[in-house]
UniProtKB/Swiss-Prot annotation:
<feature type="compositionally biased region" description="Basic and acidic residues">
    <location>
        <begin position="44"/>
        <end position="59"/>
    </location>
</feature>
<dbReference type="InterPro" id="IPR027856">
    <property type="entry name" value="Glu-rich_5"/>
</dbReference>
<feature type="region of interest" description="Disordered">
    <location>
        <begin position="328"/>
        <end position="374"/>
    </location>
</feature>
<feature type="compositionally biased region" description="Basic and acidic residues">
    <location>
        <begin position="120"/>
        <end position="134"/>
    </location>
</feature>
<feature type="compositionally biased region" description="Polar residues">
    <location>
        <begin position="16"/>
        <end position="26"/>
    </location>
</feature>
<feature type="region of interest" description="Disordered">
    <location>
        <begin position="1"/>
        <end position="168"/>
    </location>
</feature>
<feature type="region of interest" description="Disordered">
    <location>
        <begin position="241"/>
        <end position="299"/>
    </location>
</feature>
<feature type="compositionally biased region" description="Basic and acidic residues">
    <location>
        <begin position="328"/>
        <end position="359"/>
    </location>
</feature>
<feature type="modified residue" description="Phosphoserine">
    <location>
        <position position="169"/>
    </location>
</feature>
<protein>
    <recommendedName>
        <fullName>Glutamate-rich protein 5</fullName>
    </recommendedName>
</protein>
<keyword id="KW-0597">Phosphoprotein</keyword>
Amino acid sequence: MGCSSSALNKAGDSSRFPSVTSNEHFSTAEESESCFAQPKPHALGRESTVDGNVQRESRPPLQKLKVSAEPTANGVKPLQEQPLAKDVAPGRDATDQSGSTEKTQPGEGLEESGPPQPGGKEDAPAAEGKKKDAGAGTEAESLKGNAEAQPLGPEAKGQPLQAAVEKDSLRAVEVTENPQTAAEMKPLGTTENVLTLQIAGELQPQGTVGKDEQAPLLETISKENESPEILEGSQFVETAEEQQLQATLGKEEQPQLLERIPKENVTPEVLDRSQLVEKPVMNDPFHKTPEGPGNMEQIQPEGIVGSMEHPARNVEAGAYVEMIRNIHTNEEDQRIEGETGEKVETDMENEKVSEGAETKEEETGEVVDLSAAT
């Protein structure tokens, strides 16, 4: 690195000062070549870095030399600078060659990492030859491996096929050797299927039977749940009908009772009035007639007719009215006794009147009509 940096510095100085002599330029070129040509012990892995730095550092001064070869501000090209271009050409060739060798060396160094090989340019070609031989050997080995691997592929595919075919053949042989067992195995499967079908068929009727049983149970439950309500409703209806009948009967009985009561109340009054009318007439001696009992009989039916207008409706009404009439007659007798102070007996009076009429007929021989006389 020391000579390369000094050469670069000198080249830079020469570009700055165009008045440098040709001898100095030649010396700088020789020094740069000697720097590149000197063998240095270095590792193969480090060659890329060192040579890369050399290339990077060597290229800028060449460009600067090119710039120095361009026309100056005065427009005159110095004659001393022309041989520099010629001298620079072999330098470029050397740098290009070194760059090409350096480009090949880093790849080889990456392929094989080994101990550092000290030596110059003479050692490098031998190492390169060895590396090439080793690379060719590895490539040949890899090709052989590929060539061996390629036939293995179909063979490997064929082996599973052969194994499958062998298995199938073994199975076929077993089947042929034991056809009875195969036949027995098949019916077993069929019998199992039949059994399962039979079991399923039995389960289905059981399910249907269960449904049939459930339906009557539901019906009975519904009937049991509904029957009390229905019975209660029917009983309630019957009781309501009975109540209605009772109400109607009560209504029918009420008018009958009302009819009885006014009739009972009216008949005694009529009887009382008839009796009152009859009694004064009977008391008068001039108005007494032998037909008195007949009149009484005629009057009494008139009073009874008012009470017996509806004998079909109620038969008991007649007896009840007769009892009341008797009671009223007794009351009238008591009233008459209270007024006159004497006890009046209608029966005795009627007998006396009849006897008096008979005596008159015997005397005169004629019937005396009291009514006509009056």
